[in-house]
């Protein structure tokens, strides 16, 4: 299961959806696409406004500068991940700390 912790300015993502075999998992692909697209958009707007870390265990996205457009993109990312969790509750769990 993918476990996502969401707070006001930070998102942490861990795990694997286990929806299908590695390389064929549409839920993992959806999470990856949503996160990569959103982070790239935020970095394009203000490369110093977001901290993005992707290591073997966790993906972490944190808003570090107050920027209206970055905040909108970040909030959109949170909503997309919550929607995916609603659609695939056995594979994605969102814990909100807001």
Describe these PLM feature segments.
Residues 1-26, 33-36, 40-98:
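N-terminal intrinsically disordered, cationic/polar leader segments
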């Amino acid at each position: 299961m993918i476990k996502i912790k969401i707070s006001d300015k930070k998102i942490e993502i861990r795990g694997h959806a286990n929806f299908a075999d590695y390389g064929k998992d549409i839920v993992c692909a959806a999470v990856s696409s949503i996160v990569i697209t959103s982070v790239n958009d935020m970095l394009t707007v203000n490369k110093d406004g977001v901290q993005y870390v992707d290591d073997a265990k966790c993906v972490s996205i944190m808003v570090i500068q107050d920027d209206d457009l970055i905040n909108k993109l970040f909030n959109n990312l949170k909503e997309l991940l919550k929607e995916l969790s609603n659609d695939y509750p056995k594979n994605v769990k969102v814990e909100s700390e807001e």
